Design a protein with these regions (language model features):
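Conserved structural position at the C-terminal beta-strand
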Residues: 455-457, 541-543, 629-631
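Surface-exposed, short loops/turns at beta-strand junctions within beta-sandwich domains
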Residues: 444-450, 530-535, 618-623
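Short, surface-exposed alpha-helix to beta-strand junction/turn motifs within ectodomains of secreted
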Residues: 416-429, 500-514, 586-602
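Short strand-edge motifs at loop-to-beta-strand transitions and within beta-strands
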Residues: 438-442, 523-527, 611-615
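Residue-level detection of beta-strand-connecting loop/turn positions
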Residues: 70, 171, 288, 339, ...
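Eukaryote-biased RCC1-like beta-propeller repeat architecture
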Residues: 1-5, 10-391
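Beta-strand/beta-sandwich contexts
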Residues: 388-418, 460-503, 546-592, 634-648
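Short beta-strand segments within Ig-like beta-sandwich modules, predominantly Fibronectin type-III
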Residues: 89, 190, 358, 431-435, ...
Length: 648
C-alpha cells in the first residue's frame, strides 16, 4: 500500500505507464524542479528534463527522486550533503543516476537524505547523517553514495521524514532510526538511534508516514496511530478533561496536550486507507474518497476552509471527494483524484500549489490543468507528479509577428510530437503541424502583447518560460508629418514621425508609393513625395507587422501653386525687374517652377522655399498682365489683383 510521507518530502506513490514522465512546480533555487534551470519559482507544472518510464517519485527538502521501471533511481536538486547519491556534493538541475542501485521498488526523500527499498527487502540510504538518518551505524556526518541500513530486512514500505525514517516490515511491525529528541522513533525514548529500533507496540501495520518530527502508522483495521512531536497537535491526541470539585460543585477542565509522545497513540479516525505526514500536520484518506486532516494550520494546510490555528480533531477537507492518493508537503497538501487531476491547498508563496498564483489557499484548488496523473509527491516547498509526459517549449521563431496573426511560427522543444493543441496565450493556433518530436510549425492567431506559446499533451500544458515568448507587434502609427503640404509636382522630402516605423517596407502618399524613403529610426522616416493631385492624402507606412491606420495626423496636402503678392508689382516695359513672388506650392531650387507674364516667361527664377521665389521680368507692353506660376504641369489659378504686374 503506497503512502504519503513527509515534511519535506512526500511518499513515493506508484505509477503505471512505462512512458510516464514527471512534472514539477514550486520553489527551484536548488534545481529541485529538474527542468535544467534554477529559475527561482514555477507556479504551474512543467516537465522534468529527460525522464520516461517513471513509476514513482518523492520530493525532499530541496531535492527530488524518481524510480524508473527498470529499478534504477534518478535524483536532482540540492546535493550539499550528498542527498543525490552520485558520489559528489555538487547539485544538479537535471536528473542524474544514483550509481550502484538496481532492483529498487520504492524511494523516499527526506529533508536532506534519501532512501531506496530493494526487491530483497533491504534498504539503502545516502545523504546527511547528522542525526543518524542513514541508519547504518555509520559515524560520519554524510554519505554521498548509498549505504545499507544496518540489520534491516523484510521491509515492505519506507518513509523518510525531516531527520528520521520509518520502515514497515513484512510481519506488520514498524521500525525507525535517526533523530529521536521529540519521540519520533516511537520506541519510548527521546534519543536518536543510528540503527533501526522497533516502534513500540505496533502490529498489523500496513503503511507508515514520517513527517517533520512525527510519525503515523495505518493499521489493517483502518485506524491510525501517531507519535513524536505534538507542538501543533499533529498527533491528533483526543482531548481529555480532569474533574475538579470545589465547594460541592464539579467542574471539568481541559487538560493540556503533551508537547510530544515517544510511544504510539490512537487517532480518532476510522475507515482509513492511506496516511500522509507533513511538517506539522497529518492526513488520512478514507475509503469513501474523502480526506481528513489535523494539526497545524498556520498556512491553511488542513484545507477545511479555516485559516490559521491548529486542531487535534480530524476534520474533512472541504469539497473534496473521489481522492485516490494524498501527499503532504512541508506546509502544503496534494490530492490525486480518480480522474487523474490534482488538487492542492495550503502554503503557496513559492507556487507549490501549481495554480498559477502565490496565494495560500484554505480549500483545494486545481494544480493547473494536469491530467492523467498517476502519482503525486509534496516536498518542502515544491511538488511532483507522475503522468503522461508534458511538453517543453525551448524556442519560438520568429519570436514576433503581426497582431492580425497569420505568421508561420516554428516551435522547438521536447515531446512536441505528443501535442494535441498549441496556444498563443489563451488563443489556439490557427493550425499546426507536428514536424518531429522537437519541432512544430503553427500559424499564429490574432493577438496583442507578449504571450506564452504553450503545447498541450495528454499530461497537461507546458509551463510558461522565458524561451516560449511570442510578441504581437502593433502596426506602425504615424503621429506627425513635416511639412504638412508641398507642391503637387512631388519631389519634396517629407519627414514622417511615429512609432513602429523600423523595418518599413513601403511608404505611400494616398495610393501612390513614395519616390524613395529612408528609415531613420523606429520613430522617423524620410520620404520623397511622388507627384499627386491637388488636395489632401493620407500617408501610410507598411512594415512586416501591418500598415498604419488612417488618422488625422498622417494627412499630407498636395498644393497647386498660388500667387498672393508680387513685390514690386510694376516695372518698365523693357523687363529686367527683379520681383519677389509670395504664395505657395512652389518647388524649391531653380528650374522646376516657372512664371508666365502673359505668354512670356520670366527668367532667372529661383525659389527659396515653397512660398517664396525671385525672378526677372521679361519685356512686355505697357499695361496690366496676369502672372501665372507653373510647377510641372500644375498652374496657379487667377488671383487678381495679387497676381497682376503692371508694365509702365
Amino acid at each position: 500500500m503506497s503512502i504519503a510521507a513527509v515534511l519535506v518530502l512526500l511518499s513515493a506513490a506508484s505509477a503505471g505507464a512505462s512512458s510516464n514522465g514527471v512534472a514539477s512546480w514550486g520553489y527551484n533555487a536548488s534545481g529541485q524542479l529538474g527542468n535544467g534551470t534554477t529559475t527561482t519559482i514555477s507556479r504551474v507544472p512543467g516537465a522534468v528534463s529527460g525522464l520516461s518510464g517513471v513509476t514513482a517519485v518523492s520530493a525532499g527538502g530541496e531535492h527530488s527522486l524518481a524510480l524508473l521501471s527498470d529499478g534504477t533511481v534518478r535524483a536532482w536538486g540540492n546535493n550539499r550533503l550528498g542527498q543525490l547519491g552520485n558520489g559528489t556534493t555538487t547539485g544538479s538541475k537535471v536528473p542524474v543516476a544514483v550509481p550502484g542501485l538496481s532492483g529498487v521498488v520504492a524511494v523516499s526523500a527526506g529533508k536532506q537524505f534519501s532512501l531506496a527499498l530493494l526487491s530483497n527487502g533491504t534498504v539503502m540510504t545516502w545523504g546527511t547523517n547528522e542525526d543518524g538518518e542513514l541508519g547504518s551505524g555509520f559515524k560520519g556526518t554524510k554519505s554521498t553514495a548509498p549505504v545499507l541500513v544496518k540489520g534491516l530486512s523484510g521491509v515492505s514500505a519506507i518513509s523518510a521524514g525531516g531527520n528520521f525514517s520509518l520502515a514497515r516490515l513484512s510481519n506488520g511491525t514498524a521500525t525507525a532510526w535517526g533523530a529521536g529528541d521529540e519521540g519520533q522513533l516511537g520506541n519510548g525514548k527521546k534519543l536518536k538511534s543510528t540503527t533501526p529500533v522497533a516502534v513500540k507496540g505496533l502490529t498489523e501495520v500496513v503503511a507508515v508516514a514520517a513527517g517533520g518530527e512525527h510519525g503515523l502508522a495505518l493499521l489493517a483495521n483502518g485506524t491510525v496511530m501517531s507519535w513524536g512531536c505534538n507542538i501543533s497537535l499533529q498527533l491528533g491526541i483526543p482531548t481529555t478533561y480532569k474533574v475538579i470539585k470545589e465547594e460541592g460543585e464539579i467542574f471539568y477542565e481541559e487538560e493540556e496536550q503533551p508537547e510530544n509522545s515517544a510511544v504510539p497513540g490512537a487517532v480518532p479516525v476510522n475507515g482509513v486507507t492511506a496516511v500522509a505526514a507533513g511538517s506539522e500536520h497529518s492526513l488520512a484518506l478514507l475509503g469513501t474518497g474523502e480526506v481528513m486532516a489535523w494539526g497545524g494550520n498556520g498556512s491553511d494546510q488542513l484545507g477545511n476552509g479555516t485559516q490559521g490555528g491548529m486542531t487535534n480533531v480530524p476534520s474533512a477537507v472541504s469539497g473534496l471527494g473521489g481522492v485516490t492518493a494524498i501527499a503532504a508537503g512541508g506546509q502544503h497538501t496534494l490530492a490525486l483524484l480518480s480522474g487523474g487531476s490534482v488538487e492542492a491547498w495550503g502554503y503557496n508563496p513559492d507556487g507549490q500549489l501549481g495554480n498559477g498564483t502565490n496565494l495560500n489557499s484554505p480549500v483545494p484548488v486545481a494544480s493547473s490543468d494536469l491530467s492523467g496523473v498517476t502519482a503525486i509527491a509534496g516536498g518542502g516547498v515544491h511538488s511532483l507528479s507522475v503522468g503522461p509526459p508534458l511538453a517543453t517549449v525551448t524556442g519560438v521563431s520568429p519570436s514576433a509577428g503581426a497582431q492580425t496573426g497569420g505568421a508561420s511560427v516554428a516551435i522547438s522543444g521536447v515531446n512536441l510530437d505528443l501535442a494535441s493543441a498549441v496556444h498563443f496565450g489563451a488563443s489556439p493556433a490557427g493550425a499546426f503541424t507536428i514536424e518531429s518530436p522537437t519541432t512544430i510549425t503553427a500559424t499564429a492567431p490574432p493577438g496583442v502583447g507578449i504571450v506564452d506559446v504553450t503545447i498541450t499533451t495528454a499530461g497537461g500544458t507546458s509551463a510558461p518560460n522565458a524561451t516560449d515568448k511570442y510578441t504581437y507587434v502593433p502596426p506602425p502609427a504615424i503621429t506627425k508629418v513635416t511639412p504638412k503640404k508641398a507642391p503637387a509636382v512631388g519631389g519634396t522630402t517629407v519627414t514622417i514621425g511615429g512609432t513602429g516605423l523600423a523595418g518599413a517596407t513601403a511608404v505611400s502618399f494616398g495610393a501612390t508609393p513614395a519616390q524613395s524613403f529612408t528609415v531613420n529610426s523606429s520613430t522617423s522616416i524620410s520620404a520623397v513625395s511622388p507627384p499627386g493631385t491637388a488636395g489632401p492624402v493620407d500617408i501610410s507606412v507598411t512594415t512586416p507587422y501591418g500598415t498604419s491606420a488612417i488618422t488625422t495626423t498622417d494627412v499630407f496636402k498636395y498644393e497647386l501653386p498660388t500667387i498672393t503678392s508680387l513685390t514690386p508689382n510694376a516695372g518698365p516695359g523693357q523687363g529686367g525687374t527683379i520681383v519677389t513672388v509670395h504664395g505657395s506650392g512652389y518647388a524649391p531650387g531653380a528650374g522646376t517652377t516657372t512664371f508666365k507674364f502673359g505668354k512670356a516667361s520670366a527668367t532667372s527664377v529661383t525659389c527659396e522655399s515653397t512660398t517664396t521665389c525671385t525672378l526677372t521680368t521679361p519685356a512686355g507692353k505697357a499695361g496690366v498682365l496676369d502672372v501665372r506660376a507653373l510647377v510641372g504641369k500644375y498652374k496657379s489659378l487667377e488671383n487678381p489683383p495679387a497676381d497682376q504686374f503692371t508694365y509702365e
